[in-house]
Each structure stands twice: as structure tokens, then as C-alpha cells.
């Protein structure tokens, strides 16, 4: 079957020369052909993501057209404006995929609002809402290596597509022949017919105004003298992040030169993920050189932001997503109470794998902290529930441990622009009172306890990898450990059982240990990985780290 499909592609006019060359190069390599054609990339609530290349199991113009036709078929049943917003980041073939998606939608009589320059995830979510679209499409693979690209789908609220909508789109994709099934007109024809229009400056300005309105202490940064190093990691963050920081009064910004402009090859950091040290390395070198107070880095689609803070001894320390989530929650709560801008019955939201330290901080400030499944769409869903009752202003902050933050209801996905703005404002505030982010973090630990949150990942590549991941999760369910490193398991929460959790079904297991530590195990939703999340609590960092290391050592053989 897969050989027949390979031969069909090989004999077709694939338009993209790269695809022809790749197929010709694997003509006698059965394993390579099987990898590309035995299965197809599956469309889910996060859309598609895969390696660039030829075949049904790769990202290419034909798979993008097929997916877009599936989205178009769904939209045509929805009424409304019959409009889709599209954006793209700096990844290879991003503009090509965005134009092809627009052309397929136009061929279906659907209007398109396309950004005329690469713009990040929050800009796509905002445009979807601004133009009252039926859907949004973001061409991105987030922080994956350069060989990846993806097709992220959004619903009319600017949140990732719901399970029901994604299932309908997937069904339509399966009915659409990948090479011949999608309707198509040229991009130029779509523009001439008035079906394809660019996103207007009014929308872009409205986004910046919405973000800047989320400042806790407006005008503070104009006099704080904050010195910043910033890296967009060759992605979309440069223009929007520097625009907002400049508007709020931060002018001493040094951009990492090798990572300033869009470059889908990511030559200076092969894995452009602000969660990891390697992605921040160039920025840290520059921060030390210029004596910056803070170093920021946003991932290619600018929905995540990582930082390194300057410590009193002049060294720099990376701040984890959990730590920054707690710091921002603490800063927003304290600041809004001080300024009299805290709404009545305020609500914050975090994912179930994020630090329980946030619960203690929220309780201290009288804030309701809601827990959601992993994936920012669930935080967006909580905002939508508030909005349905006209109470979206109750939402003050949401975060995930994977460096995603949102303050405000103007978009429904994580936003590294507002995250960068608030982190800089927070740093400027602590600087203005003779303190620092580092000092405030230590004060939080002194007040609530020394929590340590760490994530380990185990990769399972290829077709066999998915089977192995499924087998590991099944073993943990059917024969769960009764202890980890001598610590008894006192609770096991299986999120595959919504009747027990009160949340939608999810492939997540949480083991609670007798000393209060937790171990969370879940497959990644976007990559061939199983992730393990450890939360330990000690009298100091060394004690908490020792327990984490012991727990990780026991778990490691399960994933080998």
C-alpha cells in the first residue's frame, strides 16, 4: 500500500522541486519510504506537526492543502463570517504554507485575513477574534528543531480548536485525496477576487493596546533604568516585543545579533526552546558582557519566554517556568491590590503539572486558582466560561510550567509579548525598591517552603516509538508502582477517568508520595516524548534536589 502511494507521488507533478528530489533519493530504500507513506500525520486539536519532507507523514504543500480543505469543509457548515485568519513564523516554508492555505480557502469561497509579515501566535489568536473569524491557522512548529513545521488550528474564540471540531476536520481530511482532493486557485487570483486580504494596521495596533493595558504599574519602567538583553531566537518576537517594551519606557535593549532576524535554520541554537540553557547561551554571553539586569528569549512563534536574572554576586541564573509563573502571580496580585485594580472574585489558572506553590500564593492573596489539563487551550476554556457570564475581567493570570503565560482575555493562547512586558515591569519594580527578582523569589520560598519542580523527557522516535510510549503508559496503569525510592505511593490519579477527576479525559498519571512529593507522567501532545514532572519539597534546595534525583533514577529504567 505505502509503495503504491510512493509511486503515485513520484509520478505526480509535485510543484515543489525539493519533494521530487527527496523521493528520487529514496527509491530503493524501503524503510525510508515506509516512514514517509505508511501513515499520515494526524490532525488533532493542535493541528498538525511533523518533519518537512515528501509523503503523507511529512509536512509539505500537499499535506497543508489537504488539511486546509478539511478546515474549509468544517467552516462551510458553521455560518458566521466565513473568514479565516492566517499567520506564520520564521520556519522553513512558512510563507509558502500560509499562502497555500489561503489559496485553498479562497477556492472554497472563504475569506482570508493573512498577515503580510511573520507574526506570532498571540497575534493570530487576536486577529481571529478581531475579525470575528470562524477559525485561525498558524503555520508553526513552536520550539521544535529546524526540520519541523506545523499547522496549528484555532476556533472562532482564538483558542485552539475543540475536540469536536478537530474530529470533524479530521474526518473531512480523510475523505480528501492528498494530491487531488483540495480545491485550489492561485494566491494572486484569491487576492484579485477580494477573498484574500492582509491584516490591517488597525488590528495590529489594537493588539499592542490590549497588551499594554495589562501593565500593573504603568509608567514605572520609564524611570527604572532597566538594562535588558533580548533574543527572539531568529523567530517572530523581534518587532512585537521591542515595540511593546519601547512603548512602556524600556529603551536600553541590546538584541543578540546572531539571533535578531528571522532564520528558519536556527543556526546558533538548533533547538530554539527558551526552556533550555543552549537556547539562552548566546544571550547570556552578551548579558555578562554588557552587565544587563535581565536576559529574555522568546521562541520562534513567541508564545513562550525564558529568562535569566542577574544575581547580587553578578552571576546569572535561569528562572524556570514554574518559578516565573509564581513570581508573576505574586507580582500581579500584590500590584493590583496596591493599585486598587484587582477585580472582585479574581481568578487565576494553572495546569495540573504546574507547581503547587502557586496554590499557596493564590490563597495568600484571596485569589481562586483553577486547575486545568495540560495545554493552554484549557486555560483559554476557563476564560471562555467566565466570558459566557460577562465576567472575563475576573481572569488575572494563567500559566503553564512550560514557560507559557497570559494576563488578560484579549487572546486565548499563551503570549510571550505580554509575558516579556510583565517580566520586565516586575524586574523594574523590584529594582526601584532596592530589591530584585532573585531576592523576591527567595522571599517566596522562605514564606511558603522550598519547592523544586523539574521535568525530564524521554524520546521515542519513529513508528515503533509511538507503540513503546503506549506500552509504558499501559504498564503504569495496569501495574502501578507501590513506591518510588523507598517512598510509598499514597495516591494515584488517572486522568483517563474523567468521572474521578472532574476534568476531560487525558493520558496523564499523577503519583502522590507519602512525603508530599508528586510524580506526573504524560506523553507529550506535540512530540514523540514521555515527560515526567517531579515536585519535591525540602528544607533547602539541596534536599529537594536530592529527592528529585533519587526519584528520577528509579523511574529511568521504566523508559529505557
What do the predicted segments below correspond to?
Residues 5-101, 108, 190-191, 196-224, ...:
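An N-terminal, well-structured beta->alpha segment
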Residues 32-41, 149-279, 285-287:
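Gly/Ser/Thr-enriched, mixed-charge loops and adjacent short helices
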Residues 37-57, 141-144, 228, 232-244, ...:
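Conserved phosphate/anionic-ligand binding catalytic regions in large, soluble enzymes, centered on
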Residues 85-148, 249-306:
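N-terminal small/polar loop signature for handling phosphorylated ligands or for N-terminal nucleophile
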Residues 97-105, 148-155, 303-323, 358:
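Short Gly/Thr/Asp-enriched flexible loops that form oxyanion-binding sites at enzyme active sites
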Residues 154-184, 322-345, 350-361, 416:
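Glycine-rich phosphate-binding loop plus the immediately following alpha-helix
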Residues 288, 292-294, 315-317, 335-522, ...:
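Phosphate-binding and adjacent anionic-ligand microenvironments
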Amino acid at each position: 500500500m505505502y509503495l503504491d502511494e510512493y509511486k503515485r507521488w513520484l509520478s505526480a507533478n509535485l510543484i515543489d522541486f525539493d519533494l521530487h528530489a527527496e523521493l528520487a533519493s529514496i527509491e530503493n530504500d524501503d524503510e525510508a519510504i515506509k516512514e514517509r507513506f505508511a501513515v499520515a500525520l494526524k490532525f488533532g486539536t493542535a493541528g498538525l506537526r511533523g518533519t518537512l519532507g515528501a509523503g503523507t507523514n511529512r509536512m509539505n504543500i500537499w499535506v497543508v492543502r489537504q488539511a486546509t480543505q478539511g478546515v474549509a469543509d468544517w467552516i462551510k457548515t458553521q455560518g458566521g463570517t466565513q473568514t479565516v485568519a492566517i499567520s506564520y513564523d520564521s520556519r522553513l516554508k512558512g510563507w509558502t504554507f500560509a499562502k497555500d492555505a489561503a489559496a485553498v480557502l479562497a477556492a472554497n469561497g472563504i475569506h482570508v485575513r493573512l498577515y503580510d509579515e511573520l507574526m506570532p501566535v498571540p497575534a493570530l489568536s487576536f486577529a481571529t477574534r478581531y475579525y470575528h473569524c470562524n477559525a485561525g491557522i498558524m503555520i508553526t512548529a513552536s520550539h521544535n528543531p529546524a526540520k519541523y513545521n506545523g499547522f496549528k488550528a484555532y476556533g472562532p474564540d482564538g483558542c485552539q480548536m475543540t475536540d469536536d471540531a478537530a474530529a470533524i476536520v479530521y474526518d473531512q481530511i480523510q475523505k480528501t485525496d492528498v494530491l487531488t482532493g483540495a480545491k485550489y486557485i492561485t494566491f494572486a487570483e484569491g487576492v484579485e477576487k477580494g477573498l484574500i486580504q492582509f491584516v490591517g494596521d488597525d488590528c495590529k495596533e489594537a493588539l499592542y493596546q490590549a497588551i499594554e493595558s495589562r501593565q500593573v504599574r504603568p509608567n514605572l519602567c520609564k524611570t527604572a533604568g532597566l538594562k535588558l538583553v533580548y533574543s527572539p531566537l531568529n523567530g517572530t518576537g523581534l518587532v512585537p516585543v521591542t515595540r511593546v517594551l519601547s512603548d512602556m519606557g524600556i529603551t536600553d535593549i541590546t538584541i543578540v545579533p546572531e539571533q535578531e532576524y528571522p532564520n528558519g535554520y536556527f543556526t546558533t541554537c538548533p533547538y530554539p526552546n527558551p526552556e533550555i540553557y543552549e537556547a539562552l547561551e548566546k544571550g547570556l554571553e552578551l548579558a555578562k558582557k554588557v552587565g544587563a539586569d535581565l536576559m529574555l528569549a522568546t521562541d520562534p512563534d513567541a508564545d513562550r519566554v525564558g529568562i535569566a536574572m542577574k544575581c547580587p554576586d553578578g552571576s546569572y541564573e535561569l528562572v524556570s517556568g514554574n518559578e516565573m509563573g509564581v513570581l508573576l502571580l505574586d507580582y500581579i496580585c500584590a500590584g493590583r491590590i496596591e493599585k486598587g485594580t484587582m477585580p472582585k472574585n479574581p481568578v487565576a489558572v494553572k495546569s495540573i503539572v504546574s507547581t503547587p506553590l502557586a496554590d499557596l500564593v493564590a490563597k495568600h492573596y484571596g485569589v481562586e486558582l483553577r486547575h486545568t489539563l495540560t495545554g493552554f487551550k484549557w486555560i483559554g476554556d476557563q476564560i471562555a466560561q467566565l466570558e459566557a457570564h460577562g465576567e472575563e475581567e475576573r481572569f488575572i493570570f494563567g500559566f503553564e510550567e512550560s514557560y507559557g503565560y497570559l494576563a488578560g482575555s484579549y487572546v486565548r493562547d499563551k503570549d510571550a509579548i505580554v509575558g516579556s512586558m510583565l517580566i520586565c515591569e516586575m524586574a523594574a519594580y523590584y529594582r526601584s525598591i532596592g530589591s530584585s527578582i532573585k531576592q523576591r523569589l527567595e522571599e517566596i520560598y522562605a514564606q511558603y517552603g522550598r519547592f523544586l519542580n523539574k521535568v525530564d523527557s524521554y524520546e521515542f522516535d519513529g513508528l515503533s516509538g509511538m507503540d513503546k510510549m503506549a506500552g509504558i503508559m499501559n504498564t503504569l496503569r495496569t501495574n502501578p508502582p507501590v513506591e518510588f525510592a523507598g517512598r510509598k505511593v499514597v495516591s494515584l490519579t488517572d486522568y483517563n477517568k474523567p468521572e474521578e477527576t472532574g476534568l476531560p479525559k487525558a493520558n496523564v498519571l499523577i503519583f502522590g508520595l507519602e512525603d508530599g512529593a508528586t510524580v506526573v507522567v504524560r506523553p507529550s501532545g506535540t512530540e514523540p516524548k514521555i515527560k515526567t514532572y517531579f515536585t519535591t519539597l525540602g528544607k533547602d534546595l539541596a534536599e529537594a534536589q536530592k529527592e528529585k534525583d533519587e526519584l528520577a533514577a528509579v523511574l529511568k529504567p521504566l523508559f529505557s
